[in-house]
C-alpha cells in the first residue's frame, strides 16, 4: 500500500490537530459539572456518556496524520485507565496543554530535546511533591468517598469500600479480589464467595472470548491441574473428548502448554468447536506444587502428578475441579466460587497458618502469607443490573474503574481533588529547578499545564477559569473549588479527593506522549484509498433529480 510522508512542522501540526479534535470532545466531561457526549451506534440507540476513555475509543478521524495524533492520545487515556481506573480526562487535558505550549516553542526555534528534558525534570519534581502531600487512607468512609467520586454514585462507592473490607477479614485489603458481573436484577448487589486470583494469564491471546476487554470468561468450567508440561496432544485427547461430551468449557493450569497440545486447543477455540483456556501454573518449584494443591482444594479437583501416580492418559472427569466462573486476562486468572469442600479449605488454611508460624525466613513467611490471603480472602462479586443493555455496559465499566480507583487510593494515598493538588504543587518549579535555556522552557511548560485541569473543571461549571485558578493558587494547600456548589472549601474534609496514583499517572503519561509529539520529525501514514465510483446513472433515477 502506498504511503504518505510528512516532515517537521507539517508532521507535528497534523498530529496536533488530531490530538485537539479528540481532547476537545473528551475534556467537556471533566469535573462534577462535566457535560455529556452522545455516541452513535451502528445498531440500537445512541449511548450518552461522560466517561473519557469510552469517548476516546469511539473517535476515528479521516485524515491519516490527524488519525495518528488521536490514536497517540487514546493510548494516554487507556494507559492511565489501566493503571489507576480514572484520570483519563485529566491526562488528556494535560497532554493537550503540554503539546500546545511545547509545539509553540519548537516553532519559535527552541530545541525539542532541551524542552523534553525540561518537561521530564519538571514532572519528576511534581510527582515527588504529590507523593509527599499524599494522605494515607485510614477509614472505610474515605475509600467510599474516593470510589463514589469515580463512579459518580455515593452508594456504589460505599459498596466498593465494604467489598474491600470484606475480602480482608474486616481490614482494608488493597490486593483483595473484587470482580464485577452483569446481573438480571436491577441495581448493584455485593456478595462474597470462595475464590482466588493468581498472577498468570492465558498463554495465547486467541483464547480471549471478549477481544475488546482482552478477557476469556468461562461459565461453570472444568478445571484441569497438571504439575508437568503438556506438549503431546495424544496425552490430552482422551480427557478432552470426555470434557467436550459434557458440553462444559475447560481451564487447564499446568507448568506449561506448548506444541501440538496448545495449537489443538487454539484451533478448536477459533472454530468454535470447544471453549478452553490454557494458563501457566503460578510460582516455581515446590511453591508451584503447593499453589496447585491450593487451587485443587478450592475447586474440588486433584493435581495430576506422577509423584502421586496420576497421569493425563488415565485422568477422568471426577479428578477435575469446577467453579461457577473463571475470568482470565493476559495478566491474571480469577476463580469465582470454587466447588471444593469448605471443611478441606478450612483445614488447608489452618495448615498454612501453622507453616507461617514455623517459617525459617521472612521471605518464606511472606510467600506463605500471600497464599493464605488468596485462599482465605475470597472473592467479592459486585452484581450490576440496569434497564437496558447499553446502560448496563456503561454502568459496569464505570464500576470497574471505581474499583481500580479505590485500590489506587489504598495503595499510595489520596490528595485534594478538583485539580487543586496539581496547581498547588506548581510553586516547587518557581526557580525552573536551576535549569537554563530550552530546559527551563520545558519546566515552564509543565508549570503552565498544571493549571489546565482546574481551568477546564471551572469552565465546565460555568465559572471564569482565570479567576478560579488565581483564587485556588493563593489558598492554603488542600483547599480549592467544589465545582458542584461553586464554593471554596477544604477539599479532603469535604470528601473531594483523588488517589495520588491517578494524579501522578495522568501527569506522567501526558508528559510521555508530549515528549513524543515534540521530538517527531516525520510521520509515515497509509494513503487513503480512493472511493469506488458510483454506479453509472445512479443519480438519474426518474423523478428523483435534485435529491
Swiss-Prot record:
EC code: 5.6.1.7
UniProt keyword annotations, A-Z: ATP-binding, Chaperone, Cytoplasm, Isomerase, Nucleotide-binding
Catalytic reactions on record: ATP + H2O + a folded polypeptide = ADP + phosphate + an unfolded polypeptide
GO molecular function annotations of the record: ATP binding; ATP-dependent protein folding chaperone; isomerase activity; unfolded protein binding
CDD domains: GroEL (cd03344)
Domain of life per record: Bacteria
Subcellular location: Cytoplasm
Sequence positions that bind ATP: 29-32, 86-90, 418, 482-484, 498
InterPro entries assigned to the protein according to its UniProt record, in alphabetical order: Chaperonin_Cpn60_CS (IPR018370), Cpn60/GroEL (IPR001844), Cpn60/GroEL/TCP-1 (IPR002423), GroEL-like_apical_dom_sf (IPR027409), GROEL-like_equatorial_sf (IPR027413), TCP-1-like_intermed_sf (IPR027410)
Any GO CC annotation of this UniProt entry: cytoplasm
EC class (word): isomerase
BP terms from Gene Ontology: protein refolding
Family per record: Belongs to the chaperonin (HSP60) family.
SUBUNIT field: Forms a cylinder of 14 subunits composed of two heptameric rings stacked back-to-back. Interacts with the co-chaperonin GroES.
PANTHER family, A to Z: 60 KDA HEAT SHOCK PROTEIN, MITOCHONDRIAL (PTHR45633)
Physiological role: Together with its co-chaperonin GroES, plays an essential role in assisting protein folding. The GroEL-GroES system forms a nano-cage that allows encapsulation of the non-native substrate proteins and provides a physical environment optimized to promote and accelerate protein folding.
Official protein name in the record: Chaperonin GroEL 1
Organism the protein comes from: Corynebacterium jeikeium (strain K411)
Amino acid at each position: 500500500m502506498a504511503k504518505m510522508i510528512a516532515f517537521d512542522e507539517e508532521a507535528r501540526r497534523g498530529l496536533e490537530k488530531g490530538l485537539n479534535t479528540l481532547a476537545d470532545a473528551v475534556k467537556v466531561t471533566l469535573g462534577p459539572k462535566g457535560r455529556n457526549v452522545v455516541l452513535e451506534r451502528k445498531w440500537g440507540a445512541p449511548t450518552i456518556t461522560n466517561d473519557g476513555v469510552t469517548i476516546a475509543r469511539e473517535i476515528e478521524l479521516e485524515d491519516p496524520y490527524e488519525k495518528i495524533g488521536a490514536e497517540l492520545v487514546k493510548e494516554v487515556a487507556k494507559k492511565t485507565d489501566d493503571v489507576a481506573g480514572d484520570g483519563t480526562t485529566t491526562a488528556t487535558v494535560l497532554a493537550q496543554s503540554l503539546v500546545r505550549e511545547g509545539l509553540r516553542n519548537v516553532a519559535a526555534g527552541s530545541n525539542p530535546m532541551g524542552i523534553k528534558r525540561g518537561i521530564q525534570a519538571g514532572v519528576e519534581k511534581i510527582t515527588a511533591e504529590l507523593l509527599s502531600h499524599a494522605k494515607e487512607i485510614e477509614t472505610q468512609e474515605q475509600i467510599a468517598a474516593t470510589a463514589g467520586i469515580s463512579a459518580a454514585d455515593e452508594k456504589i462507592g460505599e459498596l466498593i469500600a465494604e467489598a474491600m473490607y470484606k475480602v480482608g477479614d474486616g481490614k482494608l485489603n488493597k490486593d483483595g479480589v473484587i470482580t464485577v458481573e452483569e446481573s438480571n436484577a436491577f441495581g448493584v448487589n455485593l456478595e462474597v464467595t470462595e475464590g482466588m486470583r493468581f498472577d498468570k494469564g492465558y498463554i495465547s491471546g486467541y483464547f480471549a472470548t471478549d477481544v475488546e476487554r482482552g478477557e476469556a470468561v468461562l461459565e461453570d468450567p472444568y478445571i484441569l491441574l497438571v504439575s508437568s508440561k503438556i506438549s503431546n496432544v495424544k496425552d490430552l485427547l482422551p480427557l478432552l473428548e470426555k470434557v467436550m461430551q459434557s458440553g462444559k468449557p475447560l481451564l487447564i493450569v499446568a507448568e506449561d502448554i506448548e506444541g501440538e497440545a496448545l495449537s489443538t486447543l487454539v484451533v478448536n477455540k477459533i472454530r468454535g468447536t470447544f471453549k478452553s483456556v490454557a494458563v501457566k501454573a503460578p510460582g516455581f518449584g515446590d511453591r508451584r506444587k503447593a499453589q496447585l494443591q491450593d487451587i485443587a482444594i478450592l475447586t474440588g479437583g486433584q493435581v495430576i502428578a506422577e509423584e502421586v501416580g496420576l497421569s493425563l492418559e488415565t485422568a477422568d472427569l471426577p479428578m477435575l475441579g469446577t467453579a461457577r466462573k473463571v475470568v482470565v486476562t493476559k495478566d491474571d486468572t480469577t476463580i469465582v466460587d470454587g466447588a471444593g469442600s469448605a471443611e478441606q479449605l478450612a483445614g488447608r488454611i489452618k495448615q498454612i497458618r501453622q507453616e507461617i508460624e514455623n517459617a525459617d525466613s521472612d521471605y518464606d513467611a511472606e510467600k506463605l502469607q500471600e497464599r493464605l490471603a488468596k485462599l482465605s480472602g475470597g472473592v467479592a462479586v459486585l452484581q450490576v443490573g440496569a434497564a437496558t443493555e447499553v446502560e448496563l455496559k456503561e454502568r459496569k465499566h464505570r464500576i470497574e474503574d471505581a474499583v481500580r480507583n479505590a485500590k489506587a487510593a489504598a495503595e499510595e494515598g489520596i490528595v485534594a481533588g478538583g485539580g487543586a493538588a496539581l496547581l498547588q504543587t506548581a510553586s516547587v518549579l518557581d526557580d525552573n529547578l536551576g535549569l537554563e535555556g530550552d530546559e527551563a522552557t520545558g519546566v515552564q511548560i509543565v508549570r503552565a499545564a498544571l493549571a489546565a485541569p482546574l481551568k477546564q473543571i471551572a469552565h465546565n461549571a460555568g465559572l471564569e477559569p482565570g479567576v478560579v485558578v488565581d483564587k485556588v493558587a493563593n489558598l492554603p494547600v488542600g483547599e480549592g473549588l467544589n465545582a458542584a456548589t461553586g464554593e471554596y472549601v477544604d477539599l479532603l474534609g469535604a470528601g473531594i479527593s483523588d488517589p495520588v496514583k491517578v494524579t501522578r499517572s495522568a501527569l506522567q503519561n501526558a508528559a510521555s506522549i508530549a515528549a513524543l509529539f515534540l521530538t517527531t520529525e516525520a510521520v509515515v501514514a497509509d494513503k487513503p484509498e480512493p472511493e469506488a465510483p458510483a454506479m453509472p446513472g445512479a443519480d438519474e433515477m426518474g423523478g428523483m433529480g435534485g435529491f
